[in-house]
Amino acid sequence: INDLPVPRMSRDPDADRVGMACKDSNGEWVLVNGNQTCMIFLYYIIKNRIAMGKMKGNEFVVKTIVTTELIKAIADKNNVEMYDCYTGFKWIASVIRENEGKKQYIGGGEESYGFLAEDFVRDKDAVSACSLLAEICAWAKDQGKTLFDVLMDIYVEYGFSLNHTVNVVKPGKTGADEIKQMMVNFRTNPPKELAGSEVVLTKDYQSLKATDNKGNVTDIAQPATSNVLQWYTADGTKVSVRPSGTEPKIKFYIEVTGEMKCPKCYAEAEKKAMQTVEAVKVSLGL
């Protein structure tokens, strides 16, 4: 069965998350992460609706703030509105509810392997996601492509992105105090640069304020506050940091973006991005 080119998919026991793997251009099995999965789903949905003439101009998609910015690039280039929300599908469901009867939801997800293709469930749903994935694989095959080819097409058209998460575990009451102090320190003394690139925008979801590198402050449109900080650099890197709500750890979500001119450039783009990730970790003392 490992000789077959078709991708593999699996869901978790409560059927709300889907994971998948496919063969790369060298015939080696690779895992498709949650950000890539969400990108592939939304790319297909948008492209398919355009091809079938179903776009009415009122469509929107939703992602969480720690999910890849490539989804915004896909949405923007295809004139689809995109909403950012907090981690958790209750927030995606809230955006759907707010726009009900006015705009059409066509998909949304988060980096932790959750996706919702339709609005009748209002929670992440692996059953419909697995069905959609099978449809995408058939669509790709009809074009003589693999799922990995589709991912490469996305990177070439919309830009390359690599996401890396760092979990810093701090157990016990002492650890909780350390995490709290880390967030205080990041707010009072935020990084001026990451991996040698200037931080041009800082978002603080606790104060709901965004501050650029010239000191200009704007409001962040979210329905509530959250203990999350984000830094955006001049070279397209995004770092999000937040304490876990369920475990004794603080999480750093690092996204490095860049150009990828052709599918054969993937290995080099990935290598370069990982070097930037490691440099970002050094900048943050991780």
Pin down the residues of each PLM region:
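Phosphate-binding and adjacent anionic-ligand microenvironments
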Residues: 6-7, 28-30, 48-242, 249, ...
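Short, electropositive, low-hydrophobicity segments enriched in small/polar residues
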Residues: 19, 23, 38, 118, ...
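N-terminal small/polar loop signature for handling phosphorylated ligands or for N-terminal nucleophile
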Residues: 1-19
